[in-house]
Amino acid sequence: MRFSHINLSGQNSALAQRCAAKCWIKTAGAAICLLSFLLMPPAWADGVSVGKASRLRNLVPAAELEQSAVVEYEQIKKQAELKGELLPDNHAQVVRLRAIAARIIPVADRFNSRAGGWPWEVILLKSPQINAFCMPGGKIAFYTGILDTLKLTDDEAAMVMGHEIAHALREHARARIAKGQLTQLGAGILGGLLGGGHYTDALQLGGNLLSLKFSRSDETDADIVGLDLIARAAFDPRAGVTLWKKMTEANKRSPLELLSTHPAGENRVKEIEKNLPQVMPVYQAALKARQGAAMSKR
């Protein structure tokens, strides 16, 4: 079978031009997408910006400290139970606090990658103390005094919890113990050089984590990180302002031991207000997502 010769040179040229144009458009589009991706801030770049946790903390084994915290926490629970001060699981305020924690804990690993593996726990102790704490490893306790005296809203209670959790996430206790060890070791070496007596083992962790006093910089750090945590959990971070105003007023009526190492109330409020522009968009996005999830369940 014979085929007639057909001249396709013109058609081939036009086809080549169209292909080249399409390729250029695709290449340009890909370049624009790549540029947009490179210029887009990563997901972790929103919210507050804090420096790295103190490197001194590495002098203290995290696992050992967290195990010590578990032991001390269990002792606190047993003592409170014997005195009738450990409120039951079905108590309205216990249920409330655990619901708040259930929203904050899932976002905690933003500031500490090990937080997801911690055995988190929340208890409420019947006591007039205006206080709360979170031990290394996620062991949380509130005193009824802080809830009742300050009449905390859910957002304000979340701010207290976020602040205390931030101490654990940023490993402030671990760093404080490390600093104490270095001081003790230095004193021991100096005592040895001067012919002094014996000194206790500088590598011993010590027995009372609740007696540790955080520095003012630790407290400010915990405020800022706590602000970020509650915003991601869809709690209003502006509650940080109202909370510390309540704390300041309560301190005027009767000086609070809780605030003895904390920054002054006015400075604290100013620092929180300064960081609100960084966390309000995070809060609004989290709130919208939470409301959307609630609507989808109906």
Task: List each model region and its residues.
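A Zn2+-metalloprotease active-site environment signal
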Residues: 2-19, 24, 37-298
